[in-house]
Amino acid sequence: MYAIYKQKKYDAELRLGKDVTLYSYMKDEGFENYVDPLGRESDDFFSKKMDIHELDYLYEVKYEFLYRGHYFKALSTMIRKLIDKDYFEIAAGIEKYDLIEKLGFKRLDESTWWKDIRRKDIEAIKIIEEPEGIFKEQGLKIKILEGKAIDDFLASVKD
């Protein structure tokens, strides 16, 4: 989850629908040294607790990959390590059973199937920005990347 606070993007966590914690590797104004659940204090990672109403925006990002003419949820996370290994996973539910059987998906659990694919198999990436909390009414923002834009996006991903 991400938050925009004072026009800057942060990793964020939402609790109880209103309590937000921002995370940063920079000690921005009002941020304190992060303390993990075991009580260890970090010198290079910081956090700031706040009410959701103090934010400019709060959202979750989800991805879908266009594979053989159909969009599927990205099951693998968008992290550098997996991108460098050219490893992507897609998932589908029972509603697409005939299609996933034909495309060689494997059963993950009772209602979900998955398949690992490579970059060359991805025809497009749909980036879905879903507002959270009090920002939900703003609606989804969807961006579709194709061709070189996919490669540029994947090259820009950091951990």
Model-assigned labels for residue ranges:
Residues 1-159:
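Short, surface-exposed polybasic-aromatic patches that bind anionic ligands, especially phosphate groups
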